[in-house]
Amino acid sequence: MYTRNLLWLVSLVSAAPLYAADVPTNTPLAPQQVFRYNNHSDPGTLDPQKVEENTAAQIVLDLFEGLVWMDGEGQVQPAQAERWEIMDGGRRYIFHLRSGLQCSDGQPLTAEDFVLGWQRAVDPKTASPFAGYLAQAHINNAAAIVAGKADVTSLGVKATDDRTLEVTLEQPVPWFTTMLAWPTLFPVPHHVIAKHGDSWSKPENMVYNGAFVLDQWVVNEKITARKNPKYRDAQHTVLQQVEYLALDNSVTGYNRYRAGEVDLTWVPAQQIPAIEKSLPGELRIIPRLNSEYYNFNLEKPPFNDVRVRRALYLTVDRQLIARKVLGLRTPATTLTPPEVKGFSATTFDELQKPMSERVAMAKALLKQAGYDASHPLRFELFYNKYDLHEKTAIALSSEWKKWLGAQVTLRTMEWKTYLDARRAGDFMLSRQS
């Protein structure tokens, strides 16, 4: 299989392996099977239970593997589990692990590694950003454990032997197996955590069960991973190495692609016509299930006042941001993308009104909250460093100044420090997705 250079309008972050392939007989391979991917920024962590963003998930999906994976058609496929049974009307699942599973250090991977991973996810001490994910899956006692009302050992998951994992749900969840492909429900090596504790996720201590292992981490530059010979499907892992580059500017990514230094990168929608002419056949436009939004800090003025929050909500020109600023995006009125199977989006009548009416409503709300031309609304808009995020922030601040007279200060940080500040509540209005 040749490593082919591709440009993507958006990054496809899925639970599907990007490295496995069935190579036809006599197919010539490229001399070096190295894949260089623009991942935009350094991940906040590589601990599966602490992952909260796509930049980390993309790497963790290559370093670790769960019970199942999702193929390109969105279908659940066996991964660490070779098969499973569903019992008690969908309230109990029995997963049978493959024989001979190993961690990257050669130690056996067992059902207990899954139990530990899932217990870590709901343990308040872990502070997993996806702790609620297990409660949403209705795993027995997950919600109570997250709330601090039950012990982690009461979680509805147990190892009946080294190769058998039993999961008990509080109610049937038809899509439960699809949820297992997300890193929060990946296994972690109990023998490594027993030795290193919270320091297990430092690069020098980590042990993996996925197709690749961490080889090098140059902060804010790149992460390099190499093929894991202990991986269950190593014979089909064609790539020998993957490089995840922290290029936080789409133009830089594109220029390095043109220079042959990157194999896959994002490009701004505005550049598509020119790229289709200059690089025919190399551009892929792929839909992505993702919603970008801004999060209010409700514990700080002025956003502890619902009238202020509604005023900003009403005066966001979603069409402008989606079509003109970013391009090829769909204006969002809900957090859940409308393409999600079985989801019916709610129509909010007030967002269907002309902008002039929405502005009048917003101004009235701000006046009630004590803001006017002599006392304008002032706040800080916080986003992680990336050129498209900056364009969005500038557009929003300009719109709010034009419609409401708001004085908006822009603040940006590198991804890791941005996450730390957001977790600490050090923001007023912050970008999320």
Give residue spans per PLM region.
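N-terminal lobe/hinge region of extracytoplasmic solute-binding protein
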Residues: 22-23, 38-88, 119, 205-208
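Short, well-ordered beta-strand elements
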Residues: 32-41, 92-94, 165-166, 210-213, ...
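A structural "hinge/loop" feature
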Residues: 41-57, 80-81, 107, 129-130, ...
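Aromatic- and charge-enriched surface segment that lines or borders ligand/interaction sites
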Residues: 82-133, 166, 256, 302
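Extracellular/periplasmic solute-recognition and catalytic clefts
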Residues: 215-226, 243-300, 323
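Structural transition elements
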Residues: 330-368, 386-391
